Amino acid sequence: MFIFIKHGDNQQFLANINCSVLLLLHYARRKVGLPKTETIDLCDETGTMKLFFLMKTPGDYANKFLTARNTYYVCKVERGAPGTRVESAYKAFVPLLKNPEPELIDALRTQCDLLERSRVKMLRIQEAKKVVPIESSVNLTSKSSGRSDEEGTTRRAPVLKTRADFVSRKDKHR
């Protein structure tokens, strides 16, 4: 089973999809003359990215994700500058075509924006999951050695609230 991959100035080549996604991308990268360090992906004629560069298992066969005899375009995935705060940000999906259709560019831009918003949202969720100590006004007194409450040492302890604390409260009110 083969697909057509277009690039450059209306150039195209055949690619066998009875191989791993990783091997297919290495082959496509070599055919279009990009270095191994460049991140690429394929999109169909409507501009729908296949998001192979995000795959957890690049050893999966490409024929699971691509349709035989269809045409796909090579796209370069542009990320933020290395060593900066935005190095993992998605900047653009650039089709490696001399004159890409405006509809294709719009579809790729929309997908890139959605992917970047999703990435930022996941970062915010991960930061929110970090347990932050909440100062409590509860004083814990030491009741050892038979001292009275006035003589006891007091200390403030942070109260940590987890998701389980909130769930158990809801269940009590039912």
From Swiss-Prot:
Disulfide bonds: none annotated. GO terms for biological process: transcription by RNA polymerase II. Pfam families: Il2rg (PF15874). GO terms for molecular function: RNA polymerase II cis-regulatory region sequence-specific DNA binding. InterPro entries: CXorf65-like. It comes from the Eukaryota. Residues 162-174 have a biased composition (Basic and acidic residues). This is Uncharacterized protein CXorf65 homolog. It comes from Bos taurus.
